[in-house]
């Protein structure tokens, strides 16, 4: 085996995963989700990037004397679309992002210098008192 062979393979794998993640992010950004409220009386179309690209309001809910209901329906439709975008992102990117996480760092060895509470360190149980305290 040549020196650095494992590192080269690891780097190539990381670059492939990064490319897959970028492609998945681009697909997500270009995807569309449809949110609705009031049983479909208000509908919105939102891209995976969060950009609102369409709003449809059934004329039945347009009442000049009750603007608050229409406002609530629009907010509800937007919330529905936002939740769908989040779910889609988790489904598409979750597995890829998890595969790209670096391994956890090794635990510090016992007796690591400068760790509070270590025997013999000032202020630790059974250790000499800290001057001035």
UniProtKB/Swiss-Prot annotation:
SUPFAM superfamilies: YbaB-like (SSF82607). The keyword Cytoplasm applies. It is found in: Cytoplasm, Nucleoid. Residues 102-113 have a biased composition (Pro residues). Its main location: cytoplasm. Residues 98-133 are annotated as: Disordered. Keywords: Cytoplasm, DNA-binding. GO terms for molecular function: DNA binding. One of its GO terms (cellular component) is cytosol. Signal peptide: none annotated. Disulfide bonds: none annotated. The keyword Repeat does not apply. Belongs to the YbaB/EbfC family. PANTHER family: NUCLEOID-ASSOCIATED PROTEIN YBAB. NCBIfam families: DNA_YbaB_EbfC (TIGR00103). Binds to DNA and alters its conformation. May be involved in regulation of gene expression, nucleoid organization and DNA protection. Homodimer. This is Nucleoid-associated protein Rv3716c. It comes from Mycobacterium tuberculosis (strain ATCC 25618 / H37Rv).
């Amino acid at each position: 085996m040549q020196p650095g062979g494992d590192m080269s393979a690891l780097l190539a794998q990381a670059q492939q995963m990064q490319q897959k993640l970028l492609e998945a992010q681009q697909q997500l950004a270009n995807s569309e989700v449809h949110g609705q409220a009031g049983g479909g009386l208000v509908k919105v179309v939102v891209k995976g990037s969060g950009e609102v690209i369409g709003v449809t309001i059934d004329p039945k809910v347009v009442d000049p004397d009750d603007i608050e209901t229409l406002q609530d329906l629009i907010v509800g439709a937007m919330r529905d679309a936002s939740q769908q975008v989040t779910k889609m992102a988790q489904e598409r990117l979750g597995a890829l992002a998890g595969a790209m996480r670096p391994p956890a760092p090794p635990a510090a060895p016992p007796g690591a210098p400068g760790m509070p509470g270590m025997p013999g360190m000032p202020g630790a149980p059974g250790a000499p008192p800290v001057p001035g305290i």
